[in-house]
């Protein structure tokens, strides 16, 4: 377990800390901050069916430590396949990872493969804008899942990111060490 996991599992947060956290979240949302702030915020019109569920899958780089240690057998392609199989009528958005777009990291970028499982690929858009389009975010370990939680979206995890297992997310895998129920 990590230091963060131990803090979350074993600490009681008083009203003052919770109030400070709430103010910080408000600032994050007000300024549309996320881990990657290099992409512009855009309003995109999706061509979906009426009442069609919209799912965002934020891509991840396969050699990232969170994927290696927390991916639990999932890679981006397996995630795409699993989400499509379990949500056949959904409109699925694939958000290419910023480090893959910039060419700095390796990741799934073959659109012919990606578009077998999703309806649209977004690249040059902020994660905040992408999250605003969806009803749910499905991820392995991406911090975009945490961004989505802050924005009151349903989040489904398939690996074990730091924010999974606390009652905030719908988890494909369970972490028996995480027994405390947290809130934002």
Regions found by a protein language model. Give the residues of each.
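Catalytic-core helical/loop segments in enzymes performing group transfer/polymerization on anionic/lipid-linked
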Residues: 2-184
